[in-house]
């Protein structure tokens, strides 16, 4: 059955990170550009996959890539915090709600995303797996803009502080696996294995 497209909430793919722990052959690599599944890059995989669920998917990053897609460019070149991407997205898109997801969480199910997008009476609705809060796999309302501005002004880039000081709610999910974050090459290899296993049923 085809997924009904979410057309009233844009999805912003957060890809402005540092990849500091992602090392291949003793060299730091940009994980967004690592080949993934049958796609030339993780970026292309995530963008293509999310377009099956959202009418509008935009990539938030420091610079645009070869992939033909809409980009939101983060101007802060030497500072790495997802808060810049979230703040910039609200200023640019001028929309009440935005769903955010990091580039390096390719296993999050559409069911989980739909569950998060289905609750709209909080400022931040985020995913929580058995061991961890996932503040970046989340639906945000534009009424967080003042809190975002204040956090950036005071240089408090801790996402947990901001979320806990706004009307937020955690949605509990019992599958740890789907929230696997590809911080390292080992995580990346594990994700590839999981998808292979899923494909073979």
UniProtKB/Swiss-Prot annotation:
GTP binds at residues 14-16, 31, 104. This is Molybdenum cofactor guanylyltransferase. Its EC number is 2.7.7.77. Keywords: Cytoplasm, GTP-binding, Magnesium, Metal-binding, Molybdenum cofactor biosynthesis, Nucleotide-binding, Transferase. It comes from the Bacteria. Its cofactor is Mg(2+). GO terms for biological process: bis(molybdopterin guanine dinucleotide)molybdenum biosynthetic process. Disulfide bonds: none annotated. GO terms for cellular component: cytoplasm. Mg(2+) binds at residue 104. Monomer. Belongs to the MobA family. Signal peptide: none annotated. PANTHER family: MOLYBDENUM COFACTOR GUANYLYLTRANSFERASE. It holds the Pfam family NTP_transf_3.
